[in-house]
Swiss-Prot record:
Induction: Expressed from 2 promoters, 1 of which (trxBp1) is under control of SigR, and further transiently induced (about 50-fold) by the thiol-oxidizing agent diamide. Part of the trxB-trxA operon. Component of the thioredoxin-thioredoxin reductase system. Participates in various redox reactions through the reversible oxidation of its active center dithiol to a disulfide and catalyzes dithiol-disulfide exchange reactions. Stimulates complex formation between sigma factor SigR and its cognate anti-sigma factor RsrA probably by reducing RsrA. This is Thioredoxin 1. The keyword Disulfide bond applies. Belongs to the thioredoxin family. GO terms for molecular function: protein-disulfide reductase activity. One of its GO terms (cellular component) is cytoplasm. It comes from Streptomyces coelicolor (strain ATCC BAA-471 / A3(2) / M145). Signal peptide: none annotated. The gene is trxA. It is found in: Cytoplasm.
């Protein structure tokens, strides 16, 4: 599945994210959001590099407004890391790949 991140929905969020054994980074995004498109290649690269430690998925807020509202996502891109069914970290705004990796250090370190 290289080059494409899994898409989750309001309906699949609990099973795919909250009940996942691994930490899951959820990219809250929308098709009209330029910065969201800018970080997509970085997220795909991080998924390829660290996929054994963290799962990275995308949630389109226009198609799935319920989950975004539930977690208070007010601006995009917002990256939430869920661990054990809870938000463990929130990253707001577009950042370079290296900065995102630094933010994820607690979840991807050996």
């Amino acid at each position: 599945m290289a080059g494409t991140l899994k898409h989750v929905t309001d309906d699949s969020f609990e099973q795919d994210v909250l009940k996942n054994d691994k930490p899951v980074l959820v990219d809250f995004w929308a098709a009209w959001c330029g910065p969201c498109r800018q970080i997509a290649p970085s997220l795909e690269a991080i998924a390829a590099e660290y996929g054994d430690k963290i799962e990275i998925v995308k949630l389109n807020i226009d198609e799935n407004p319920g989950t975004a509202a539930k977690y208070g996502v007010m601006s995009i891109p917002t990256l939430n890391v869920y661990q054990g069914g809870e938000v463990a970290k929130t990253i707001v705004g577009a950042k370079p790949k290296a900065a995102i990796v630094r933010d994820l250090e607690d979840f991807i370190a050996d």
